[in-house]
Amino acid sequence: NGRQYVIAHSLKKMKQEDREIALNPQYFRAPGSREYVDISTLDESNRQVFQTIYYKEIPMDEQETLIVTYSPKYKAYQRAIRQSQIQRAQKILDSPGKKRRGKNPNDPARFIEKTAICKTGEVAKTYVYSLDEGRIAEEAQYDGFYAVVTNIDGNPEDIMKINQRRWEIEENFRIMKSEFEARPVYVRRED
């Protein structure tokens, strides 16, 4: 249809084999470089490395390309957010009362695991609540990664710049929906 797009793509919802390729630490590039970088060997304490966004291109089909980016800075940000959510989950565990299950992807209660205790195999009436270390590790593997799908042929660095401006576009839509006020318009025909 002739339209060009750059859209976010969930790494968590990809097929297992595609996700393994996307999260493989090899074959990333730094902007302006033709050499491949293994991101697992990066010295993220180096300020320049910390500020750099690395990328890899993965052809999806003849028209689409998946661009996976990795940012040590974004990784640190996501870890800090999750760490505060884990602390909030621990507070829920430490406080007496009903334990609740996390209903949305950012709810700290999603890190709380409910285990039934029963020796006879009957339905247990007693539960043990604990931090779900498996869930925490599962989410940690995506730290620093972001993916977009595009049908634009061109330099992946330009596509990354388009995606970096995405938050500004989203912010403008939020303003339009929440803060923009207009008076009603009445249209009247002469006949």
Task: Tell where the protein language model's regions lie, with residue ranges.
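Anion-binding and metal-coordination hotspots
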Residues: 1-191
